[in-house]
Amino acid sequence: MSGSENAHSGLTRRGFLKATAAGTAASALIGGVSLGAFASELRSGQPENAGDSIYQGICRPNCGQCCAIDVHVRDGKVVKTAMTHIPDSPEVNRICLRGLSHPYRIYDPERIKYPLRRVGERGSGEWERISWDEAAEEIAQKWAEIQEKYGSQAVAQYAISGGYGVFTTNHPVYLRLNNLINGSKITGCVDMANAVGINRVVGWGEGVWSTNDARDVVNAKNLFIWADNWSEAQIQEWRFFCDAIESGVNTIVIDPVYTITASKANKWVSVRPGSDAALILSMIDVIISEGLTDVTFLQEHTVAPFLVKSTDGSFLRQSDLSGTSTAETDKGDELRTFDVHAANRNTGTSAEVESPILVWDEACGALVEVEKAVNPAIEGEFEFNGIPCKTAFTLLAEEVAQYSPEKAAEICDVPADTIRELARLCADGPVTHRMGWGSQSYVNGAHPAHALITIAAITGQIGYPGASCGAADWSASSGWAQSYAPKYGASSSPTLPVLALPEIIESGEYGGEPFALKAMLIHHGNPLCTSVDMNRLKRTVFDQLEHIVVVDSVMTDTACYSDLVLPVAQWFEFEDITGGGQTNFYTGFNEKAIEPLHESKTDSDIARLIAEKMGLGEYFTETDAEILDDAMLSSETCQKLGLSYASLKESKLVPQRTGVKIAFEGAKFTTPSGRMEFYVEKPVAFSNYGQDIDVERERLPRFFPPGEAWPENEKYEKYPLTLMTSRTKYQVHGQWFSVRNLRELDPDPTFRINPADARARGVEDGAWAEIFNDRGHCVAKCIYSEAVRPGSVVYMKNWAAKYFKAGSWAEVLSLEFDPVTVNHCFMDALVDVRPWSQED
């Protein structure tokens, strides 16, 4: 097949290699930088030539770091990117290979130069060049026709995490356009199972996945790392893990795979993929049975003493005894009330006023309001006014009693004695638990997170230096609650999770009403690469759309399957503001260093142009500077810092906090009760599209098998290998795939497999092999690795389809998801592997 046209991209593999070789001539634009120069010392603020200028940039993909970088410009061209030196915060001075490679990304030979219209079949790679005016006219005409025929909701925008900034995360101008045409929105459904499991216990006020500042891990006595390969997935946080090791922190890695992170830890525990919740529940059982709980913390800062009615699972309140409903409850001293946090997803309600919760106070032998109790009972079974009750802690203890270490050992393949050892370490504080994105990538993914935050609750290991439990520290985000997008009203059309689109479109219904989706504008996302079950997604969703527009800088898998492709400006070709990241707690100003290349336009200008063609230009008179100023004025953090667009543009980088942040310091939680709610009174789905959920299952952390990747699954006999993902330091969620110097270092999509499994299938080390199941296949290069657990395959995620000999990872991944988390389950898939014998 060598030299033939690739249906995915319209560019042959041979043609791509020629283009890459030809692109070397363009290296003069970036100072002839070679791979060897990556290792050189790059001094901040020091131009290499007298005529060079240095601009402040922020590297802002969804790696989560938002590193400040210097953008060196010579004769109107970016010639180098280097680490910004922030003297007051040397620990955040970082840059990685991706950050260093920005000039190659900007001047990528594959960069889209002008608008393209499809002239062949979708995916054929046949395009024609058109003008921006033609493109905008076509979009306006198609959208008007579709909305007139099918309704306003039939046009939708899809965006996910293609960048972090006001324009690249909040998408204010696109959203205003969508609001004005009353269009639908589509969400990406990625990495939210951890959030559901964690935040329904602690609340959402500290941000998503909340944990202590990464610099705090050095203060832990025991550091647990769960399904997180920091050395590759969180490059900039890795140094803090190393600091902890050097300081003598006892580090334990729980991961099916022997990762680089695991190799540096004091202890590595290989757990069966998808069984993390069973392991953690067993650890809770040991902690309870051995009396290792922090009783005072349980009484004062958790729902442990709350009495749960056996009749309906809700908490016993004063109104249950007085016969007075919540709405009729007097707000006097005798029945003190509290407001449910308006943003709390546990309840799905807004500022409800509830009757006071009651507990059994052993000090006086009576029911009292929880805040008045002196010694509330955390264990016990009671009956009041004919209502049987148990404490929330009793219900937890009963649930975990099913998972003795011996029983859990059968499920998770971890020795019972090891489970006991881990449990005891969890009570020996300070203890930090850091969760990665592995255990949440299964249908049962919320429950490992829910169980782990429950361990922190029952041991009191949260809210002080060295003691935390979470997946990431996003508290430095400035929170752009913009008023710009909804200024003229919000769209009444629905927000749809991408995972539910096949079901919605196939049924033709949403919320019990007829529903049609016929056009999609996709920006800051690449669903045909980064989503799952790509063949079904194409068949049931994309092939049913009458018009697909993709805004991007290169021909992604999704762009290749669209009708119109619009070239967008790169990050250093326009101004933007970022609110900080996991290891960068600065609000940063990204200066415009160069003009947009070729005919590319900024996202704002693209949205404005479409609006003009739709007769809506009068609603888009604000400049980008005014939009950024609006974002800062609506940010509580920026207001506290006294920041405006003008002041930040002058300062460039402004710290949002001093010192090391401690999540939930002083045991302050933003749940309805103000406590850690390991028992969830009112579980709700993270993204509601009218689905049913199992409320009882979600009240407590539980174990149930993954949707597919489990030995007892009916598909296991046919496909006996669990497919697990690993992140690469050379790409970020599908970005940087075409950057030629990084492809020199990482040229081919690969998968790792235990040699015993590979040899049993006749697959040779270094050979191309086919990974397959009933959904599809992909052909990637095999790497033998003893670090991979037998019965597993580990793939490097989000490679563009054109780099495979055939297929792609997105073809073999399962669409099944939990209706509570509505989260992509990237590891919940079974496959098999066989040699690939076809020609290149």
Regions found by a protein language model. Give the residues of each.
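Extended redox/cofactor-interaction regions of prokaryotic respiratory oxidoreductases
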Residues: S2-E5, T169-D243, S247-I252, A278, ...
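Short, glycine-/Ser/Thr-/acidic-enriched flexible segments
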Residues: G64, K77-V78, T84-P87, S101-H102, ...
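N-terminal leader/propeptide and maturation segments of large enzyme subunits in energy/redox metabolism
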Residues: R118-E134, L292-A416, A593-Y679, L723, ...
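Glycine-rich phosphate/diphosphate-binding loops that line cofactor/substrate pockets in enzymes
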Residues: A136-V155, D213-K221, E399, R420-T432, ...
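Short beta-alpha connecting loops at secondary-structure transitions
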Residues: A265-V271, Y586-P596
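Long, contiguous, secondary-structure-rich segments that constitute the structural scaffold
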Residues: D603-S647, G734-W736, R740-R752, A756-D840
